Every structure is written in structure tokens, then in C-alpha cells.
């Protein structure tokens, strides 16, 4: 019974997982959050270079909705990681490793977006939702999304 007399308590639907599983789940989420910004930046740099011929801090700040100092700080981090090269007065360029990461991120996004479209989500919402989901989906789940999409007819 619940605290209110006469009202039965609802059964618990889920059980608490063991400690190791719980820890691993939270570790994976933290790792996904860490990778999320990195992926977004390298993908944006790649897109800007492809679409407008250059990637400038001012353009990145505008598209990400952040300040230029925030972009500058992240670019230093990406350079330290070996993902980009910054050339004064010329812009930001991806290294081979950075371009590979951008391509992988773009593919993950497309798989998730196509899956959402097959489910009937509108194109605008599918694009937006995929932007957040792509970073938090395992390879196994991506493979399942890809297979489902192929079976049910999308791009």
C-alpha cells in the first residue's frame, strides 16, 4: 500500500542493475559527452572547408552559437590532439586524422537520421535529433539502425 490509505503502490517495472553495469553505463555517457564537442567541431570544420572554402573562428562561433574565445580554446585542444592545424591568417585545417574523425561522425549522423526518417520523424526533427543522438549510440545499435533502415526502405 502507498502512503495514502486504500491506494495500492505500483509495481516496480525495472530493477536496479548491478554496480559494475551501472558504473559502465555512466562511464560510457561521460565518454560520449567528451567526444561530442570534438566530433561537432571537426565535422563543422570539414563542412565549412568543403562548402565555403575555409574554416574561420568567427564562422564556427556563429554556427555553434558560442563566443570566439570559446572556439579558440577548443581549437587549441584539437590542435594538441593532432586533429587540426591552425595557420595564422589562413585558417583552420583538418589533419588526416581529423578528416577521418569528421567523416566517421558524418556517417554516424546519417545512419541515425535515416533511421529516424524511416520511423516517420519529420526531416527537420530527424536532423536535429540525430545531432544529439549520434554521439550516444553504440556501434551495435548503429548496426541495428543501419539494418532496420535497409530493410524498411530509406536512402
Curated annotation (Swiss-Prot):
Task: Please give the superkingdom of this protein's source.
Answer: Bacteria
Q: Is Cell membrane set as a keyword in this record?
A: no
Does this UniProt record's set of keywords contain Cytoplasm? yes
* GO biological process terms held by the UniProt record: negative regulation of DNA-templated transcription; positive regulation of DNA-templated transcription initiation
Location in or out of the cell = Cytoplasm
Which residues belong to any copy of the HTH dtxR-type domain?
34-95
User: What protein am I looking at?
Assistant: Transcriptional regulator MntR
Organism field: Escherichia coli (strain K12)
Q: What is the lineage of its organism?
A: Bacteria, Pseudomonadati, Pseudomonadota, Gammaproteobacteria, Enterobacterales
Q: What is the name of the gene encoding this protein?
A: mntR
Amino acid at each position: 500500500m502507498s502512503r495514502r490509505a486504500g491506494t495500492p503502490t505500483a509495481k516496480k517495472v525495472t530493477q536496479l542493475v548491478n554496480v559494475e553495469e551501472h558504473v559502465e553505463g555512466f562511464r560510457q555517457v561521460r565518454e560520449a559527452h567528451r567526444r561530442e564537442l570534438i566530433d561537432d567541431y571537426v565535422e563543422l570544420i570539414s563542412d565549412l572547408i568543403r562548402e565555403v572554402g575555409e574554416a574561420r573562428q568567427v564562422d564556427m562561433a556563429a554556427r555553434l552559437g558560442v563566443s570566439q574565445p570559446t572556439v579558440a580554446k577548443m581549437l587549441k585542444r584539437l590542435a594538441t590532439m593532432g586533429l587540426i592545424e591552425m595557420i595564422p591568417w589562413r585558417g583552420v585545417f583538418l589533419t588526416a586524422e581529423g578528416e577521418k574523425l569528421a567523416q566517421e561522425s558524418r556517417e554516424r549522423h546519417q545512419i541515425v537520421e535515416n533511421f529516424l526518417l524511416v520511423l516517420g520523424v519529420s526531416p527537420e526533427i530527424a536532423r536535429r535529433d540525430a545531432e544529439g543522438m549520434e554521439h550516444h549510440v553504440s556501434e551495435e545499435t548503429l548496426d541495428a539502425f543501419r539494418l532496420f533502415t535497409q530493410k524498411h526502405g530509406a536512402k
